[in-house]
A protein has these predicted regions:
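A short glycine-rich, hydrophobically flanked beta-strand micro-motif that places a catalytic Asp/Glu
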Residues: 41, 159-163, 170, 282-295
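Active-site nucleotide/adenylate-binding loops and adjacent lid/helix of ATP-dependent enzymes
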Residues: 63-66, 72-218, 266-271
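A short beta-strand motif that forms the metal-chelation/ATP-contact edge
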Residues: 48-59, 171-181, 295-313
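Anionic group-transfer/hydrolysis microenvironments
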Residues: 127, 164-165, 290, 306-308
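C-terminal active-site "lid" helix and adjoining low-complexity regulatory extension at the edge
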Residues: 17, 251-271, 278-284, 291-338
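ATP-binding N-terminal substructure of ATP-dependent carboxylate-amine bond-forming enzymes
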Residues: 1-80, 84-87, 104-110
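Oxyanion-binding "anion nests"
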Residues: 201-244
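Alpha-helix-centered segments that form part of catalytic cores
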Residues: 77, 231-260
Length: 338
């Protein structure tokens, strides 16, 4: 092997490497198990190799996603394909959104219009995509729907149109057949007290956000950008106990709040995620669902799979009660690479 094509730097973080990146978080967890590591560059792609007792046990991409050794090829393919993932979960008897897959040259006009008639709103997104890339929500007009699909097909050969389900996202992490973590990604919201105007409640929420510390992701202030729910009346006075959802964001950067809900999650979510992972032979799988109430397994909908989640999310619970998944993943890596 040509040594000029390999650049190795053992156990030394590159200056530009984010300490909250996936590779940094998993590296720290593996080091605590006694692993050493080195970076190599092969054909202009950066990799990291992990050694245990002088034997290379795992090699992974450094960016953007990690190639976990627990992920087999079929699982990776199904997870990346939102249509395949939805079909698989539906075949297991769990709730999925009604959907239509559209490809270049086959726009399925009648099926799309039929789906729109049966839905409050639709969402358009690429079949292959992550981090909300290319996602358009709240489509309720036929012409807007066709224009959105047409525009989406300029960037992707295949898009999926689904019924939009309103609720908050829950990320379920299954490792070695057992639900290991569950975090709620709660949309930006405030709770009324029967006295304050909505604008005052938002100001109060922002004051609380300013006190949040010990999170890998910083919480932004709520503003007109992340409070994008239509028809918000800032002068209104929500009644005591009323939850006012302010926006659609499911990421912290878009106003969402993250909480560890492992101890309060309804048992049905645990059974569902473990059942799906087991049936796929998955040693590691992330199942994302949308729910109106994580305490009840009655009003939910499957969203998508993930095989390389953003780890810093689990260490950004706003109350400081984080979901410590890195050691769990490190132990799974250690076990499967023996």
């Amino acid at each position: 092997m040509d040594s000029q094509n390999i650049l190795a730097r053992e156990n030394e973080l590159k200056p530009q490497q984010d300490s909250a990146s996936n590779i940094s978080i998993i590296t720290k967890a593996l080091q605590e198990l006694g692993y050493s590591w080195s970076d190599v560059c092969l054909d202009n792609v950066d990799y990291r190799q992990f050694k245990y007792e002088d034997r290379v046990r795992w090699t992974t991409y450094i960016q953007p996603a990690l190639a976990y050794p627990m992920i087999h090829r079929a699982l990776s393919q199904i997870s990346r394909n939102k249509t395949a993932a939805t079909d698989y979960v539906e075949s297991k008897g769990y709730v999925t959104p009604k959907s239509v897959t559209v490809t270049t040259g086959n726009c399925q006009h009648s099926e799309l219009e039929n789906l729109l008639e049966k839905s409050q709103a639709l969402v358009v997104k690429p079949v292959y995509g992550s981090l909300s890339r290319g996602v358009t929500r709240n489509i309720s007009d036929a012409q807007i729907l066709h224009n959105t699909v047409k525009a989406a097909l300029l960037n992707d050969d295949c898009v999926i149109v689904q019924q939009q389900f309103y609720g908050d996202e829950v990320r379920l992490v299954v490792v070695d057949g057992v639900l290991a973590a569950a975090v709620l990604r709660q949309r930006p919201q405030v709770i009324g007290d029967g006295e304050k105007q909505l604008r005052q409640l938002i100001e109060q929420e922002n004051a609380q956000r300013g006190l949040i510390s010990d999170t890998m992701v910083s919480y932004p202030m709520l503003n007109e950008i992340n409070c994008d729910m239509p028809n918000l009346n800032l002068d209104s006075v929500p009644y005591a106990g009323e939850t006012v959802v302010l926006g659609y964001g499911s990421m912290i950067a878009n106003g969402a709040s993250v909480y560890d809900v492992m101890d309060v999650l309804a048992a049905g979510y645990k059974h569902m995620s473990e059942d799906i992972a087991s049936s796929m032979g998955a040693k590691f799988l992330v199942v994302d669902v949308i729910t109106r109430d994580p305490h009840n397994f009655t009003d939910y909908c499957f969203l998508e799979f993930n095989t390389s989640p953003v780890l810093k999310l689990f260490y950004s619970c706003r109350d400081g009660q984080h979901a410590d998944v890195a050691p769990i993943l490190a132990n799974a890596i250690h076990k499967i690479t023996k």
